[in-house]
Amino acid sequence: MIVRLAAAQYATGCDVDENLDTALRMIDEAARAEPTVLVLPEFGNHLSIYDSAEHCWDVAIDLDSAWTRRIGAAAARHAMWIQFNCTVRREAGRVTNTNLLIDPSGRLTAANDKTVLMGAEGIYLSPADRPADVVDAGFARLGTYACMDGVVPEVPRTLAVRGANVLLNSLNSFALDEASTHIPVRAAENRAWLVACCKIGPLLPPDRLAEFAQNMGVPSAMLRGAGESQIVRPDGVVVAQGPRDDEAVVVADADLSLCGQPRPDGTDVRRNRRPAVYSGLAQPTPVADDHRRADRLQASATANVHEVASLVRNGSMLVVLPELALDDASIGTITAALAGTDAIVVSSRRHSSHDGTSHCGVAISASGVVLHQRQIHRVARHGWVDALGDSVVTLDTSFGRLAIVVGDDVLYPEIPRLAALAAVDVIAVPWASGGEPWDVELCLPERAAENRVNLVAAGPENVVVSLPADFTLWAPERRRPFDGTINLPDIARAHQTVTAEIHPVRSLNRRISRNTDLVDGRPWQLCQSLTD
C-alpha cells in the first residue's frame, strides 16, 4: 500500500493565538499535496522557555481547546491525520509536552507525553508516566514521539515492538546531528517509515537569547530551529528533506510493504529480538563500580591479521579484526605478538562446546584468550550457529572496561545499551556486515553516541568512533567552537586500516544537557514492552 506522508516546518513565537493561526495556515498549505499523514513541529503553542511555573501553565493548552477543535476541523476538512505538539495542562498542576494525534474525522485519538525532557524543559514540565499509545490507523500503526525521545533508542523501540510501522517525530531542536544521524537511525533499526518535523526560526525569546547563549556555550546565531524535516524509508534512506532555514512542506509517497522487511542476507531483525536477554533495560541503572579508565589510547581496526604485530609495536593498545578472522593458529600467533604489552586484540571465531556451535567474539591478551562473548541474535548468513549468548560479558583492561558486540548484534540497540549499563567504556565490534548503507553511516556512530561509549569496528569498512571532550550543553568552556551538533562523536573510517585516538575516561560524562543523562535518564520504568 502507498500512502503519502508529509511534514510542515515553520517558526513559532510566544503568542499562543498567533501560533495556532500559523499552524492552520501550514496545514492548509500542506493539504495541497493531499497527504494521508501530516506532522507539525514540537512546542507548537509557545517557545519552550517560561518565566515561571505560572507562566508555563498559562501558555499551555487544554485537551479540549481551540487548538484541538480547530486543528480537528482542519483534519476533517482535508481528510488527513495530523500530529501536532503542544504543552498541555494536566491534573494536579502538571504540564506536559504532548504529541496530539487527530484522525481524519477530526477526533483526538492519542495524547502521548514526551518521556525524556531536555535540559531546561524539566524545570516546569513533567515527563510521561505511561508508555505512548500506538494508534491503528487502518493503513498503518502510528507511533508518536518528540525530539529528545529519539536521541535515545528506548521510546521509538517500544513503539515499534508494539507494532508501530510509521513513526512520527515532532522536534524543537537546533542540533544538526538530528537530521544527519538521530532521526534516520530510528527508522532503520525499527524497519519503519519515519516522518520527522523540526522547527525553524529562533527557539528563544529575543530578550533571553544572549543569556542562554552564554550559559549554554552556544553562539546565539545557532539557537535556531535546525529544519531539515525529513521522511525516512525503513532502511534508513532519507527520501525527502526540507531546507535548513525556510518554511517548507516535505512530502513523500511511502510504500508500506517495505516495513519490517528482512535485511539483504535474509535476517529478520524484528523477529530475531531476544527480549529475555534485555531484562536490564526495564530496571534502574546499576550503581557503577570504580575501574580504571585511560585518558586516551591508540586504537586500530584492520582487516589484515598480519598487521597486528606492527600495529601493537607502533602503539595501538586495542586492535579489532573482522568477524571470523581467527583460528587456533592465529590466536597463538597473536598471543605471542602481544608478549610484554597490555594490548588487546579482538575478533571472533567458530566455537564448539557441549551445547552446540556458537559465533564467539574473543579478546586476546599476552596471556591468551581472556574474554568469550557469544553472538546473541541469529543471523541468516550464519546458519551454522545453534548456540547463542544470553548476556553481555565485560573485561576490565589497563585502559578501561571493554565489551565485544559480535557481528550483527550491533544492529540491535538493546545490546550496546546493556553494555553501557555495565559501565563499559569501549565497545569492540568484529563484523562482516555492510548489507545496507545505514550499517556504517548511521548504526556505528549512533551506538557510540546514544550510550557515550567509544567504539572500534572492523568489517567491510574499518571504523574508530571516539567521544569528544565537548559534549554537555550548559558548559560554556569548550575546547573547540560549537559546530551545531549536540551528540555526534568523532569518526575515522576507511576501507584500509584505521588508527585513531579514543578516550575511555570520557564515557563517565553522559550528561547531554542540564538534568538530562543519556543513560541514567533513560525511561526504564516504561520499557517493559522491550523485555516481554
Predicted regions mapped to residue ranges:
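A short C-terminal boundary segment appended to hydrolase-like catalytic domains
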Residues: 257-293, 502-532
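CN hydrolase (nitrilase-like) catalytic-core segments centered on the catalytic cysteine
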Residues: 61-83, 150-249, 331-346, 411-499
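Ligand-binding pocket scaffold of soluble enzyme catalytic domains
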Residues: 6-8, 135-138, 299
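Conserved hydrophobic/aromatic positions in well-ordered beta-strands
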Residues: 6, 100-102, 230, 250, ...
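Short polar catalytic/cofactor-binding loops
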Residues: 9-14, 301-307
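Extreme N-terminal starter segment of soluble prokaryotic enzymes
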Residues: 1-5
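Active-site catalytic loop in hydrolytic enzyme cores
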Residues: 61-63, 89-166, 171-185, 265-269, ...
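Cys-nucleophile CN-hydrolase/nitrilase-fold catalytic domain and related Cys-dependent amidase chemistry
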Residues: 16, 21-105, 109-111, 173-192, ...
